[in-house]
Regions:
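Nudix hydrolase/Nudix homology domain
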Residues: 3-6, 11-14, 77-79, 83, ...
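Acidic, metal-coordinating catalytic segment for phosphate/diphosphate chemistry
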Residues: 13-58
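Residues immediately flanking
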Residues: 24, 68, 168
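Conserved Nudix-box catalytic region and its N-terminal flanking loop in Nudix hydrolases
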Residues: 37-48, 58-99, 103
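Short secondary-structure junction motifs
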Residues: 60, 76, 109-111, 150
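A short coil-to-beta-strand element that immediately follows conserved catalytic motifs
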Residues: 108-119
């Protein structure tokens, strides 16, 4: 019954982000947690990751990376997946992926343009802005191969500082040897490489 669904919550006039708590297989447990609480407690939740790729002149691929805004609650100023975001409580994976691309980059993609390549389990603990942060996510990973001109993107300033194209192999090396400031899981990046 749609009338029994909590659709909006605010605290001091600021909208709160709610996540469905999930099990290891990605099934919703029926519990919902607020974003900050989920990240404080290390609660398992869903995210969507969209990797935008293009062929390059070296017969390889370039990957579009976004540089996270300095005001992000985790990994500020780090290079990250082309477009990524949490799945809000009650939302589906594909609608979340399409929404994130539109909100962060201004790309109006269609469902048939996203290629599902797998899921990735990511966990880490750190401290950002003086607060503990325990991420525990199950990411649904997609490739997007449509032409993208970064000059035409409309970046969400609160989320994304800039975007750059980087050669896939150069990016892989930067992730592995730590020369690229990033928050990319090496295992997920390998998954992308296998799908190219």
């Amino acid at each position: 019954n749609k009338s029994d669904v909590l659709e909006y919550v605010a605290l001091n006039g600021k909208p709160m982000e709610l996540f469905d708590v999930i099990d290891e297989d990605g099934n919703k447990t029926g519990q919902v947690k607020e974003r900050g609480v989920a990240h404080r407690d290390g609660t398992l939740h869903s995210t969507v990751h969209i990797w935008i790729v293009r062929p390059n002149q070296e017969s390889g691929y370039d990957v579009l990376l976004q540089k996270r805004s300095e005001c992000k609650d985790s990994n500020p100023g780090s290079y990250d997946i082309s477009s990524a975001g949490h799945v809000s409580a009650g939302d589906e994976l594909m609608e979340s992926a399409l929404r994130e691309m539109k909100e962060e980059l201004g790309i109006h993609a269609r469902e048939d343009q996203l290629q599902f390549i797998g899921t990735h389990r990511g966990q880490f603990e750190a401290e950002f802005h003086g607060k503990p942060f325990r991420d525990n996510e199950r990411s649904t990973v997609y490739l997007y191969r449509e032409p993208v001109d970064i000059k035409n993107l409309k970046l969400q300033e609160s989320e994304v500082e800039e975007v750059i194209w980087m050669d896939f192999e150069e990016c892989r090396k930067g992730i592995v040897d730590g020369t690229l400031p990033n928050c990319i899981y090496e295992g997920e990046f390998q998954m992308v490489g296998k799908a190219l």
